[in-house]
Amino acid sequence: MSKHIFECIDAHTCGNPVRLILTEKPDLEGISMSEKRLDFLKKFDWIRKSLMFEPRGHDMMSGGMIFPPHDSKNDFAILFLETSGCLPMCGHGTIGIVTIALEKKLVKPKVEGILNIEVPAGVIQVTYQKKDKKVSWVEIVNVDSFLAEKNLSIISDNLGEINFDVSYGGNFYAIIEKQKNYSDLEDFKAEQLISYSREIRDKINKKYSEKFIHPYLSLIHI
């Protein structure tokens, strides 16, 4: 039986847990973080499952690994690890990982106050303010967003027919507005919203699995 010891730093983004993995990072194949993301999922997904899932992790945890950039103009690269997979982009994870990396001096910005970071979805720009040894705030300029599809529908076991649009902003997101079978967040309990959201997500993925592919980043899809 093989034995692996991972050194990590845990933090949080407004209460949402973040875990930066420092050691035992795999040697990934690929010329971009998008390609390396797929290589990780193919060969090393056990790392994600071991560190993100309970008992070591949490359903809301965002994890990540820092890698050297592929383009020397950028500062570094991030691979995101979540319970749901390896997201092409994660704002929660970015804010937490950047904060850890700066406060622990794990990265050296090329320009103080600005970081250009490679993620599987592309290159994001992060601005931050650091006072003494602490990061006081982090802002992100994300990859280009766009409306992918509109006026789609699925049949929910709990709510009936649900109409939605799909937008892209580093990941594909289903946007559900008020409608006949869905009134508002305030009309449901938190556990209902979590359960219904998962069911709706799974039905969208099953029905439209081949529909949502990034127009020029074919490795990014639903």
Whereabouts are the PLM-identified features?
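Glycine-rich ThDP/TPP pyrophosphate-binding loop and its adjacent helix/strand module
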Residues: G170
